[in-house]
Amino acid sequence: MRKHKAPPSGSPRTMAQDNSQSEPSGGNGESPAATTAAAASVEAPQQSLLLGHNAADASAAAVASRLAPPPCQHPINNSNNNSNISNNSSNSSSSKERPRPTVRFISLLHVASYVLCLCAFSFALYGNVRQTRLEQRMQRLQQLDARIVELELRLEQQQLLHWPAEQTQVLASHPSDRDSSNSNNGSQHLELHVRRELHRLRRDVSHLQLTRRQQRRQAAEAAAAAASGEGGSGGGQCQCQPGPPGPPGPPGKRGKRGKKGDSGEKGDPGLNGISGEKGAAGKPGDKGQKGDVGHPGMDVFQTVKGLKRSVTTLHGGTLGYAEIVAVKDLQEAGVNVSASTVIKLKGEPGEPGPPGPPGEAGQPGAPGERGPPGEIGAQGPQGEAGQPGVAGPPGVAGAPGTKGDKGDRGDRGLTTTIKGDEFPTGIIEGPPGPAGPPGPPGEPGARGEPGPIGPAGPPGEKGPRGKRGKRIFGPGGTKIDEDYDDPPVTLLRGPPGPPGIAGKDGRDGRDGSKGEPGEPGEPGSLGPRGLDGLPGEPGIEGPPGLPGYQGPPGEKGDRGDIGPPGLMGPPGLPGPPGYPGVKGDKGDRGDSYRKMRRRQDDGMSDAPHMPTIEYLYGPPGPPGPMGPPGHTGSQGERGLDGRKGDPGEKGHKGDQGPMGLPGPMGMRGESGPSGPSGKAGIPGAQGETGHKGERGDPGLPGTDGIPGQEGPRGEQGSRGDAGPPGKRGRKGDRGDKGEQGVPGLDAPCPLGADGLPLPGCGWRPPKEPIISTPVHKDYLPDVTQPESNTSDYEQEEEEDDEQAEDNENEYDEYQDNLHNNE
């Protein structure tokens, strides 16, 4: 008989081993289930928090899931475990195994679940506090928005209440009363400025209100969408409330260039074109009748007193510019000669007159004095050709023949300096004369009627962004229905503005239409006798012959020799005014003496309600720069001859002047080679003075004359047409800091190094207008003349700049107040 007999089901040793082997397997099978349950309990509250569920509910569900029995165990396993436990307890003495860690693992899971519950509770408490603070902030913002809307409504109501009375009062005023109400211009301008600022404030507040309403609408839509999502999906979406609106974004980039505008209207007709070229010379007319005998002439050299030596030495010689000087004193002898007629003698020669008929040869008479030109006689029949007479002394120059072909240009002539040196030169034109003193101001003209309103100018470029303005709050008004769907655009447009102030004179308007041609002028007086012609070739002395026929146009002559250098000529007659000089650099800005006087005289009369301001006159400033040339006025009537001026003081010896113009032709030189003898014409009788012919074509522009002396003061010309508006000049650079001013009148005058008071100290403003010392007594300035247009333009530009600066400062203050209130 054996000691260890195996039963049918197996030996106990084998069962114990099986049980021991099954227990680890059972323990191993239990540990993955517990790990899975713990992981599920940890992930459950996290998923509930992410989905928006309450943290407390999630933690409670997690604890319940941990306390529940594991769902993966079966009853068979429980029975097996019980049997295993009993077997283990019965066989504990026989088997040596490690203790199981199941109880310790479960206690660790409980501690972790408790920690997670505490964390979830703290997170829930923090979310509740934060949500409460956000709700309080939203309530404050809503109260502020309601306050802004209420203030805006009050301001609009006040504007609507005060507007009808002011509009009816402005519209009822007659245009004629506007001129008499110049004293109210300042108050009207202030009212217009206030209304403009109120309109700008209303526009900004309306824009702010629209933005706030849009934000409210978006918040309401988001809340409604969140509520609908929560009811439909059962808490599957986030229920977070939207946060406060963010700050406004930065300004966007500049937009693209706009499309091309519509074509403009048809422009005004252009100016008249330039005059055409001079027409061809007409055919020679018929021969005139024989004229009467002319009056005896007058010896210029015996009549005129006080001739210069250069003129008397040329008596009987070659004539030139020097003989023109002899005409200056012919007025005292009864001959009507003026500077205008003398200058006209320098023009182009007129068309040749009709030749007279040939007369019979008369007996040689005694040489008579030179008489004035006779009148042109009636045209007579053509006589027979007479016998050629004996060549007489040089007669009076005949009528100028037709203009021949232009000859070749000669070599440049020679002239001499004061020392007698010769040097080649052409027609030397002297430098332009110095600018004459400013003419006296004319009498102030009557105030013109206001000009018509000019056409609207082209749209200007987009200006820079203005500064912030002030924010003005009006009294409260009734509160309207706060409907978010109502568009606030109606608040942007205000009532129509009152009619503007009457504009100034329309000097910037368009040029008027060309006037009708004036009536033909009266025939001019008989002009002086022309200058004698050049001496002819020396011939046999004989009786003076009568003027001959006008010969046919001569052939082109040969090129002549260079003549000897001429003598220095006498000073010429006053020439026409020179061309305007080059515009100088811009001078320093003068003192505001005239501007202060203008504001004191004109500004006080326009605004009598303003307090009177007493200005302290400063010392007279330096003379300003010469202004631009004014518009050319219409030619005035010829003034009366002024009386002879007082003899001036003897001046100092001046500097040596520039080289003068070429002098007159020199004395007759040696006789050149005799040319081909021409056929002597039959001397004709002097014709009668012809009638004034029709006005000829405009001649070519003449060369610049010698700068003339200062002429007498002319009468004030009529006001010219308004010129085109000039472009507005850019603002000049800031000037340098001025010198130290004159000490005050109340303080004692400081003494200089020489012990005398400093110059300018103790100066008192004059009681009368300051008049600068004139060059001549005829050039006294007229204080009553209105100021020039340039000063008016400067005044307008300065006023515009001041107004723009005031507007920018007010807008800056308004923007600052607006941001502070927000």
From Swiss-Prot:
Residues 131-162, 194-222, 790-822 form a coiled coil. Residues 126-822 are extracellular. Keywords: Cell membrane, Coiled coil, Collagen, Membrane, Repeat, Signal-anchor, Transmembrane, Transmembrane helix. The keyword 4Fe-4S does not apply. It is found in: Cell membrane. GO terms for cellular component: basement membrane; collagen type IX trimer; extracellular space; plasma membrane. Residues 1-45, 66-99, 169-188, 205-297, 345-822 are annotated as: Disordered. Residues 284-293, 403-412, 504-517, 583-602, 638-655 have a biased composition (Basic and acidic residues). This is Collagen alpha chain CG42342. It comes from Drosophila melanogaster. The lineage of its organism: Eukaryota, Metazoa, Ecdysozoa, Arthropoda, Hexapoda.
